[in-house]
From Swiss-Prot:
Keyword Repeat: no
Keywords (A to Z) from UniProt: Activator, Methylation, Nucleus, Phosphoprotein, Transcription, Transcription regulation
Transmembrane segment boundaries: none
Organism, scientific name: Bos taurus (Bovine)
Function: Component of the Mediator complex, a coactivator involved in the regulated transcription of nearly all RNA polymerase II-dependent genes. Mediator functions as a bridge to convey information from gene-specific regulatory proteins to the basal RNA polymerase II transcription machinery. Mediator is recruited to promoters by direct interactions with regulatory proteins and serves as a scaffold for the assembly of a functional preinitiation complex with RNA polymerase II and the general transcription factors.
One function term, GO molecular function aspect: transcription coactivator activity
Protein name: Mediator of RNA polymerase II transcription subunit 27
Residues where Phosphoserine is found: S132
Localization: Nucleus
Superkingdom, natural source: Eukaryota
Family: Belongs to the Mediator complex subunit 27 family.
Amino acid sequence: MADVLSVGVNLEAFAQAISAIQALRSSVSRVFDCLKDGMRNKETLEGREKAFIAHFQDNLHSVNRDLNELERLSNLVGKPSENHPLHNSGLLSLDPVQDKTPLYSQLLQAYKWSNKLQYHAGLASGLLNQQSLKRSANQMGVSAKRRPKAQPTTLVLPPQYVDDVISRIDRMFPEMTIHLSRPNGTSAMLLVTLGKVLKVIVVMRSLFIDRTIVKGYNENVYTEDGKLDIWSKSNYQVFQKVTDHATTALLHYQLPQMPDVVVRSFMTWLRSYIKLFQAPCQRCGKFLQDGLPPTWRDFRTLEAFHDTCRQ
């Protein structure tokens, strides 16, 4: 530490300057003591005045002498080198003023945000556990190391059973025509025609509905090679909306233990679009909103709503 301070500094003069500061403080204290005591210990007024003035002048001379000595020593002390390494203490000037730093309010806001995030995460976890999105009946509750991974039973149903389920659903709804094909092997693809309103391409994996595309009744649903077009969207915004709602319905109707009930429930929901352009909104009572009919159908009551009115 002494080596660091000695760079450009006269330590002997520095020590003498400290002693000079102490002497100056004593001299100044004696001046104020003299002023405090005033004129004393003399019988006549003239004698007291002369004694006070003489004593006061002596104290002032002492202050002047000590001050001159301190100035002389300060010139001998010297200045520390500007290249003196300050390390982390050199960063103190960069710190903001503590009174002007909103640290408490920022910490309080972060704490509230963290609590709100934890609360909503818990709600989301509970809802996801109630409406499980798992696409198979196999619930992997035990580690895979303890038991072999079983094949989901939903994916190994025989094609004859799938054909029978689709045939029964086709007979349930006279205004709905279902054409089943298997262009890629065992996986079925359905072309559902609902009256003269719309057509729906349903891609299935066994009895699990994997994807749906809704198009207008007069739109082309085939590719150039004669296969069902399962990738291109409808050219009309109304059927694009219905496609989005159908995808939401697939996530709502989930019962892995009874896949035939899932398909029947989805087809029942899809059949409610037979009056897509005839049913008014149950909330506002209008047929059109922003140029679109009510495209949403309630999953339980099958009532028609505009996309904004269902909120």
